[in-house]
């Protein structure tokens, strides 16, 4: 009896060992397959830096944004990038057939966060360094290579204008950007940054110190960290158009102390607008002022802030009468006002976690541009948008919870998402304008316009029915669950930019000089505004749509008043 029992016990032990071995082999095989999939999906190279690590370069002027249905068919998008996105989206989370806005809002926001992770991993590597023998100027450059110069982030060598392009920066692209704005010199730094100016740096360094390859041009040198590859701009590429030399700003009364208000001047007979603008551009001033035969160059200042314009007929007199009347004509030169272009991450983690919350299409990107240039600190984002990062929003790639940015963009609503923040700026825009702006963005990107076929299709009414209620619930949720709020209306920000922006900056607990606010006002549009208007603007809202939206407007207006805020601006409220 004991012998069979012993045999059975021995068999069970062997079976147990065999099962353990098979389980271990199964787990190891699965792990190896998973690692192989990750290696295929993500580019080879160093690991991405942690969320609190400083990223290598500022953002850019062009590049691939979020991978929507249009980007999947874009030949410029690499197969590796598409494969990586495909790996991150399981079959259960892939988009359903039909327009994107027919999916639930939460599903769309989750996909934004997935894309953030992939873009963070794929773009985190710095620009490749070239060996000393490869450090050479671009062969196809239309400018004259001057040399390699040192640069300082706090005191730029070329101070005229700044552009970024993390994916496509080339020497020709930088030269054209500077030539369009009438600059003489173009400097490239860290493979993706372009600086313009009219004054050549004083001290050069060895050519071997400029050893970073241009992001969009293999084998060409685009400076290095704190090193500029400087070219003299000779001519524009074919098809490029030079910007207007001067834009009329209005007729203004002269300040009391002209010498103090206007740092540079030119007095000559028969001076013209072009002559004065060219002179001030050479001196790197954004304003050219004409008073009779006198030309002055200046920045907007508290003494000369360009807010109290006179009737243009006052400046239409002959030069001598105009000079005696103490009036002047002001023109904007192609030169960028760079007093407020420097930005950085917060030196220490912020103790107050601030949201910049809005409904999509309410001007969140524009508000971020204003806040960044007013405070000098980057703004973050709950999502990742490669197009915004490429346009200079460097905080876009920083983890939204890093607390290294002055505030964090979000379109989220709901108690859990709202209570993660200590305070918030709630940006509200007329829902009619917001819905049109967001529909344009979804159909044609940040700077484009939806085609007529989009407005006439079933996509537009489906979009309105889905998103109009979100406009209302977004405001109501933030009023209900927000711990500390500042309500800002987009229309008021456009009408009274400096006072409203001053209030926003004070809410963020940042001290800002009046000169910096005036600089922001001078550069208020930035690079993310739809230029011009459509040849014909359709009336997209049917009477049924208007009844629906007007009901939401009344609800939000009453909720604001119930929470001791002023109601919506009069142009929102239906009459």
Swiss-Prot record:
Residues on Cytoplasmic side: 1-14
Keywords assigned by UniProt, alphabetized: Glycoprotein, Golgi apparatus, Membrane, Repeat, Signal-anchor, Transmembrane, Transmembrane helix
Catalyzed reactions: a ganglioside GM1b + 3'-phosphoadenylyl sulfate = an 8-O-sulfo-ganglioside GM1b + adenosine 3',5'-bisphosphate + H(+)
Example GO molecular function: sulfotransferase activity
CC annotations in GO: Golgi membrane
Extracellular side: 36-575
Glycosites: 257, 348
Residue intervals passing through the bilayer: 15-35
InterPro entries, alphabetized: P-loop_NTPase (IPR027417), Sialate-O-sulfotransferase (IPR051589), Sulfotransferase_dom (IPR000863), WSC_carb-bd (IPR002889)
Keyword Transmembrane helix: yes
Membrane listed as a keyword: yes
Compartmental location: Golgi apparatus membrane
Membrane-related topology note: Single-pass type II membrane protein
Stretches assigned to the WSC domain: 142-234, 245-340
Family of this protein: Belongs to the WSCD family.
PANTHER family reported for this sequence: SIALATE:O-SULFOTRANSFERASE 1, WSCD FAMILY MEMBER CG9164
Functional note: Sialate:O-sulfotransferase which catalyzes 8-O-sulfation at the Sia-glycan level using 3'-phosphoadenosine 5'-phosphosulfate (PAPS) as a donor, forming 8-O-sulfated Sia (Sia8S)-glycans. Displays selectivity toward glycolipids such as GM1 gangliosides.
Annotated protein name in UniProt: Sialate:O-sulfotransferase 1
